[in-house]
Amino acid sequence: VTAQEWSLPAVLDVVTDVAPDRDMLVSATVRRSYAQVRDRTRRLAAYLRRHGLGVRRERHELRRWECGQSTVAVVMSNCPEYLETMIGAFRARAVPFNVNHHYAPREIGALLSQVGAEAVVYHRRLGPKVAQAVRLNARPDGRLNGLLLIDVDDGSGVAPLPGSTSFPSALADAQGVHDLPVPSPDDLYLVCTGGTTGTPKGVLWRQGDVYVGAAGGADVDTRDVIAGIARTGAGVWFAAPPLMHGAAQWTAFAGLVNGGTVVLHDDSRPFDARAILRTIQRERVTMMSIVGDAYARPLVDEIRARSYDLTSLVRLGTGGATTSAGLKQALLELLPQLTVVDGYGASETGGMAFGTSTSGRQAHRFRLAAGAAVLSADRSRFLEPGDDEVGWTARVGRIPLGYLCDRTRTEQTFPLVGGRRTSVPGDRARYDSDGGIVVLGRDAMVVNTGGEKVFVEEVEEVLRQHPDILDALVVGRPSDRYGEEVVALVQLRTGAQLSPTSVREHVAGQLARFKAPQAVLLCPRIGRHATGKADYTWARRAALEAVSATVTRT
């Protein structure tokens, strides 16, 4: 049997043929089978097609940074309709894209304009923000500023925007369901990434590549292989982080393309460890993804405080932010059946490297995934295990095409190295002596102090090991003497007292003294994004504004 490339709807159709009645999407109030979701997403696709959305130009007619398909903005918190919107758009050969609903209206408007959105599917409570973003009133054809609007009732009591169609109404008419186009592996998967990288960028993946490079598929997959995996099923996957970020989407699709049930956590409210653990217990979750210490710490505290049956949970994936060694150890002691998988990757690469920890054995280095490598500092060659040069993480093979509408960034981030198209997301790394890699972080997360380079994540890890420190971030700020100085922003545990000097000595006892912070700022709360990722913009601003709590470098 000849292997073939796959679009995501084609894979899901194979899974649905094998297990139509299996739960596919589950939330606190909704439970839908694979067959139900296939019907609903076909109806949504037909609705989008009737309103003119679809493919404009085929992939072979376009350059790497160009999109020839209609785009659909998804402005929602986690819910089954989020993934149904994505799959429905794929079936229409349109391209869904994530919008961070925490953005200000100006930022949302800029993103919709940048991507060229033709439709917006939104939670009703976010409707006023969407309307403000586009700044126009409804038109007779039911569009705002030319946008097709579909609203999802989130129970907020907020009225839909004028001219908007409710999600159930969009699905009510099955006209055109049997005339849908056949999605292509060349159809796009678009991830809009921002966070620590600044202005949002649209990362363009082919679906055939994202299926293998980010969603757990394989180059050798045939229909029989996919069907065989689907019959067994992948268990129950819990996507706890927000789907408005690529990592959670890929967790969800990795579960779905392997025939699993995906459980969604309502992220419209603050992180609730008790609700998370109750969900694991109720749904018998087998695999869950989290984002670093921001998720791990409250989970550990809640497991210690109350009794839960978490014996079904055998795998915990963590990425997007550092999970400290102490918290991993606590999770493994509390849940001895657990395997903790630290993942490293980016929107520009998919999963690149993994470290696996079990009870009694913690991984301290990453092992490279297929296609992942370390590039030399000058980006001219691939390093080999044994080289001690600090270079760049890189990936070849199943990687994105480029950045939407940005030729310059596309050619910078996806260069040719040794004749191979390569993704270089911007993280520094080196090989370890045993062939693993040590990821050192982005150049933007490096403080150059007195000619020495300090990778902030390394210092943050040590700070979080202190028993009195709840959370910490490290940044650089200008220094007349050293060019830059290391600044630690520290959140103490309730009731704890700690002097800046003792914080510095704690770091200096485990790392080179030049890596210890010259300034320590005690903060009531560390700034983090909704995903749990560090808010370094907040941290740098706080460091620049502070004029006290400086200790002398020795």
PLM feature spans:
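Conserved pre-ATP/AMP-binding loop-to-beta segment of ANL
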Residues: 20, 171-192, 198-199, 227-237
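Conserved AMP-binding A3 loop
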Residues: 33-35, 188-216
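Structural core segment of the AMP-binding/adenylate-forming
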Residues: 91-172
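AMP-binding/adenylate-forming catalytic core of the ANL superfamily
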Residues: 103, 120-122, 281, 288, ...
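Conserved ATP/PPi-binding loop(s) of AMP-dependent carboxylate-activating enzymes
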Residues: 380-415, 452-454
